[in-house]
Amino acid sequence: MANSIALAEKFVPVIDGIYKKASLTAILDAQTQVSFDGTNTVKVMKVETTGLGDYSRENGYANGNATLSWEPFTLTEDRSAELSVDRMDDEETLGQAFGMIMSEFMRVNVAPEVDAYRFAKYASTADISSAAAALTDGAAVVSALRACASAMDEAEVPAEDRVLFITPTLYGLVEDLDTTKSKEVLKRFSAVVEVPQTRFYTGITLNSGASAWGYTKAADAENINFLAVSKSAVLQATKMALPKIFTPDENQTKDAWKFQYRLYHDAFAFENKVTGIYLHKAV
């Protein structure tokens, strides 16, 4: 009988690889992850200081203040699914059915949902810069991107970690412009990532699985044209991305391979770095 622990260890790197390849927001992941071990809430330190004042030869230094506070982040999204493949279906496909289903599940269901959730979370953050317009040609897109880049420049958001997420349709309008000069604005972002509209909304509804699965666009949501995000402005946290695999011999309910997947995660924007997010939505 195949060992289910060994199978899980074998498939975890494969699942992670499929997710990272399919995920569009993985580019925003921090190199060092915040640890949620033993808790569902972490606190991140925020520092605020006063600026310079005049030095007095009589009284010395201008008295300023340094304030330390803690910003709490609590995980809220606990998602899961259970899939099964009949023993004979897997055997008759030379053992390929089970692996193909896991791959398809991560690529078609998990990665798009996580992306859509993160985009909606950032787009709905209070006090971010935003604009709304119908962008019908390349010139309009370039003008909107210039306004975005200029706003981030004025807010002193580092250009080297700005990522531009934009729909393929709008990116295509920019690419179709005749002159290279018109596309110079794209250089004011460290990376450009094309996002299908199906993942790009200002709000989503996460379905429970009782009558519908995955996610849908929220009733009051708008389509996002593009979203510029500074990597330092957000925190993407995953406490658990755990697959469990049961062989047909271990499965007590039916003669089938069983795959269980649980994803406990969330995404946050730092309160004092909201200038690092710029939303442009459709009207």
Regions found by a protein language model. Give the residues of each.
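Hydrophobic alpha-helical segments and helix pairs
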Residues: 93-147
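Structured, hydrophobic secondary-structure cores that serve as assembly/anchoring elements
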Residues: 41-43, 49, 62-63, 69-94, ...
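Intrinsically disordered or highly flexible coil/loop and linker segments, enriched in small
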Residues: 24, 53, 115-119, 158-161, ...
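Sequence/fold signature of self-assembling virion shell proteins
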Residues: 2-51, 68-82, 93, 177-283
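Short, conserved acidic/polar surface loops in the N-terminal third of protein domains
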Residues: 55-57, 84-87, 94-96, 118
